[in-house]
Amino acid sequence: MAKVVDRFISYVKYSTTSKEGSETFPSTEGQLKFARLLVDELKELGLNNVHLDEYGYVMATVPSNVDHKVPTIGFIAHMDTSPDMSGTNVKPQIVENYNGKDIVLNKSKNIILSPDNFPELKKYTGKTLITTDGTTLLGADDKAGIAEIITAVEHLMNNPEYPHGEIKIAFTPDEEIGQGADKFRVDKFGADFAYTVDGGPIGELEYENFNAARAKITVNGVNVHPGTAKNKMKNSLLIANELINMLPPAEIPAHTEGYEGFFHLMSVTGSVEQTRLDFIIRDFYKNKFEERKNLMVKIADYLNVKYGENTITLNLKDQYYNMKEKIKEHIHIVYTARRAMEEVGVTPRVNPIRGGTDGARLSYMGLPTPNLFTGGHNFHGRYEYIPVFAMEKAVDVILKIIELYATK
């Protein structure tokens, strides 16, 4: 089995789930344990300036082996896995020569990965896949990216005749909870530009993403005994429901695709006395993004007039922006990635990211950073899987990008 696979199988067995609301950085101790493992591995490979900082960021350098000036390229992946599903006690399963039919992930629990539900599986008939055992996520997002970067770097270190400029690599914590770039030192990293290796199926190349905001809403009610509540009770649950129904019903994740934005209600907790709503707001276009946020403000203002001042408190905060605005100033990094894919036999699929990456924020911090595929599918859940050949191609693409810049 390829080295990239061996690495990946090893990495996913480390529990690195990030945790919302943690008071530590990184948010979980497991990420630091994994980071220390990566530091040891990078040192064994002979990289320079291998460093783990107090916030859990791993950085290292491959020195240039060419005499002429070439740009310093960075490759970045994140160590944490999504809190949407357990990442503890991951038991990857290898499915060789996939037959195009149902894959039984867990016989005792009757958990099946089926092409009826995931038709893209059919494309991998005859290929080797890595799946979960149905009880956890897999962690290809983004331990596949880490395995692919380190395998590419190992090739550079073991083949000194392979031309390359200075290469910087970084592995970040807490990307899945939106904090992956919070403590990232762009100046310390020292790259002219970078690529995150955090995308999905083979061929994905992304340099557009959502503009993103989060809206945390508190609805304050008045609770009295229901038998004597007339003209006194103010039920925060009903007001919260009214607020939800004032948003466009079709503009939710289940009804949108491509470049369409949405409002997404992530959680509701409450009682008559008080209800809390947690929304995310997403749109690719800045003007529409602002319109969505303004609608939230107007709804809150309206309900405060209707039910009384301070019935609604709205905490609206931008999270990240569409990196296209920054990438387009350095579009050669996208064109070079496209060419690299084509030269190693991968068809580029340039699509907008209906989400965000560390690269989105890093691009606004002065480090333009589009996103490359890992090869994985169905991230964040029990049906996550990754084809082995896609991982191998991801390594090839990384190496080809490096070569193209070194030989221009």
UniProtKB/Swiss-Prot annotation:
It catalyses: Release of the N-terminal residue from a tripeptide. Its cofactor is Zn(2+). It is an enzyme of class 3 (hydrolase). Zn(2+) 1 binds at H78, D141, D198. InterPro entries: ArgE/DapE_CS, Bact_exopeptidase_dim_dom, Peptidase_M20, Peptidase_M20_dimer, Peptidase_M20B. One of its GO terms (cellular component) is cytosol. Its EC number is 3.4.11.4. It is found in: Cytoplasm. The active site is at D80, E175. The keyword Hydrolase applies. Binds 2 Zn(2+) ions per subunit. Keywords: Aminopeptidase, Cytoplasm, Hydrolase, Metal-binding, Metalloprotease, Protease, Zinc. Zn(2+) 2 binds at D141, E176, H380. GO terms for biological process: peptide catabolic process; proteolysis. The keyword Hydrolase applies. GO terms for molecular function: metallopeptidase activity; tripeptide aminopeptidase activity; zinc ion binding. Belongs to the peptidase M20B family. Cleaves the N-terminal amino acid of tripeptides. NCBIfam families: peptidase-T (TIGR01882), PRK05469.1 (NF003976), PRK13381.1 (NF009920). This is Peptidase T. It comes from Halothermothrix orenii (strain H 168 / OCM 544 / DSM 9562). The lineage of its organism: Bacteria, Bacillati, Bacillota, Clostridia, Halanaerobiales.
